[in-house]
Amino acid sequence: MLAEFGEHGRLYAGGTELLLAMKHDLLRYEHLIDVKTIPDLNKIDMKNGTLVIGSTATHRAIERSSIVKQNLPVLAEMETHVANIRVRACGTLGGNLGFAEPHSDPATLLTALGAKVTVQGKSAMRSIAVDKLIMGAYETSLAGDELLANVEIPLPAKSQRAAYLKFQLKERPTLGLALVLDLDGDAITKALAVIGSVSAVPTQSDKANALLIGTRSQVEKQLGAAAEALARAADPIDDLEGSAEYKRHLIAVFLRRAFIKALS
């Protein structure tokens, strides 16, 4: 049906973003294709060390899932604070990623966790890393005939620690920061910090990640420089959620907080 309707049709699941945009005449479609009743698209399961979440699983279902809580608590915690209770009850993970709203939580954390999505086209299926899926504000790399089927998240190794923190004044985050650290005793051997909501797409910085490697005491002294590198890479913008200058300040504050939380 999606291929048949082309640009006049749009997939519909929770509708928390899409219907609001249509209500305000920001988007217009002649056909909405309801995917909520497609079998298995709302399942949450573990497969060979990978957490697999169907695209129509709601934020609330993910938040409450015992599988998610036991295997990836950082994701369950993040979902607990997505938007408001109405959005969590109706909004879906696949819809969130597919709409590519810049002020959103999931893509930032999923990028740091190395997640990928499986998409089904008219004649073929393919896999896309989340950091390659989000191309810009409200823009993805999905083809016109593709359905986002599920999200696959590799579980962190026992030596890894992950944290996600955000700052928001309204219902959308001004900033979201995800941090994943690989530990060997007191040393951090690998680090990945991803900043979201301050600009169009979740962003990381090789320089910032390099500054987050070393002993805990060494890295603590380098957090300021790492935050500056991350801010330069993200290039925050002025918008309704805050000024670029304010967001740069928040990056420094929340990188330090995420570092402490990941190691606690």
Predicted regions: what they are:
Residues 1-264:
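C-terminal structural segment of proteins
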